[in-house]
Amino acid sequence: MANPVVTFEMENGDIMKAELYPEVAPNTVNNFVSLVKKGFYDGLIFHRVISGFMIQGGDPEGTGIGGPGYSIKGEFAQNGVANNLVHDAGVLSMARAMHPDSAGSQFFIMHKKAPHLDGAYAAFGKITEGMDVVNKIAETATDYSDRPLEKQIMKKVTVETFGEDYPEPETCLLYTSPSPRDA
């Protein structure tokens, strides 16, 4: 079975592709695939960009506090779920608030390796094409709150599931919106 591949088409025409790993974080992948299929990410921005660390997006409000109206269980070691995907450059992971089960739609893509996130955030995929685009976004000028001065807009986000079925995610009570300080 082929893993799902997500294509991020940026407003400027740049393309990033990421392979998702359902064997590592099955419900997280179900959630991401579901949101992509609904067009949730289309038109959203990378609202938080830290060169040498990561780029974060997926907030419908573009502020760092928005989400899809629900949260999912955090699939990472500190939350009792085995997840051995380390936060190397290009890895996709879910942003969350302090509560381990507070991730919803916000995600981040690693610009550089960050071992302090391993086991504490739900890594679920990796950029397979377009790491140069991640680098370009990560190196864009930002304001005092790490917000890009020039909007980094995901024009269209699509997923190829190769005929595999990815069910709707299991959701939790809605915890506080993700606004992590270290991821």
Briefly describe each language-model feature range.
Residues 54, 91-95, 104-137:
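Active-site scaffold segments
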Residues 11-13:
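Glycine-centered tight beta-turn/hairpin loop motif at sheet-sheet or coil-to-beta transitions
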Residues 175-183:
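Single conserved hydrophobic/aromatic residue that forms the stacking wall/gate
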Residues 162-171:
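Short acidic, Gly/Pro-enriched loop/turn segments at secondary-structure junctions
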Residues 2-6:
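Short structural boundary motif marking the start of a folded domain
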Residues 16-101:
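Internal glycine-rich, Lys/Arg-flanked active-site/core loops of soluble domains
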Residues 141-150:
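Short proline/glycine-enriched turn/loop segments at secondary-structure junctions
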